[in-house]
């Protein structure tokens, strides 16, 4: 991973339970290079086309948590562009982890809601979603392509994850008021539920 942008998102999130917190940095729009081998076929990753996010954190968590996260990194009209969105993990009433990244600069967003459709009283991950922000600066439709679901349940310890990949179409507004139009922008949308003893990650 190379070409770290000038700015990235860092947040210290408290929990209601005393002594519990999460300190997290997410660096979007890193240039990625390397290769992936699938079966007998090898795919080369070149930094002119491929991007990644580095998600780094340390903290002491509460036992049972469910959170929503969306991460995107890529090119928009030739410029590095992406975002980090999330909520549900800790107390984000004072500050959120929602931000756009455009040409190496961070553009902070207010609260963002992930509207996941329901079917038979359950979340329907493969139907179109809607994303809205309280400041009106992130309004998107999300069209899922793949739900990588996995559940490991040892009763006391549990990890139930939906990692949904798909494409976003809509509008994001930068700090200077510039409206950025997005069409079929590829992104990931994980929704994990975890039960674990207090730990660091």
Residue map of PLM features:
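Structured soluble/peripheral alpha/beta segments that form catalytic or ligand/cofactor-binding pockets
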Residues: 1-201
């Amino acid at each position: 991973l190379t070409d770290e942008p000038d700015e990235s998102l860092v947040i210290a999130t408290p929990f209601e339970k005393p002594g519990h917190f999460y300190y997290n940095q997410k660096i979007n729009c890193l240039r990625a290079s390397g290769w992936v081998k699938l079966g007998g076929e090898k795919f080369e990753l070149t930094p002119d086309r491929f991007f990644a996010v580095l998600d780094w954190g340390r903290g002491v968590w509460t036992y049972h948590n469910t959170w929503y996260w969306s991460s995107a990194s890529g090119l928009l009209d030739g410029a590095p562009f992406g975002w980090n969105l999330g909520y549900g993990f800790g107390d984000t009433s004072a500050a959120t982890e929602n931000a756009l990244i455009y040409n190496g600069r961070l553009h902070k967003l207010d609260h963002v809601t992930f509207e996941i459709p329901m079917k038979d009283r359950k979340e329907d991950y493969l139907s179109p979603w809607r994303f809205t922000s309280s400041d009106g600066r992130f309004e998107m439709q999300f069209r899922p392509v793949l739900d990588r679901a996995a559940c490991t349940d040892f009763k006391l310890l549990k990890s139930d994850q939906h990692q949904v990949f798909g494409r976003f179409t809509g509008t994001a507004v930068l700090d200077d008021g510039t409206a950025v139009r997005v069409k079929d922008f590829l992104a990931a949308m994980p929704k994990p539920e975890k039960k674990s003893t207090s730990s660091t990650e």
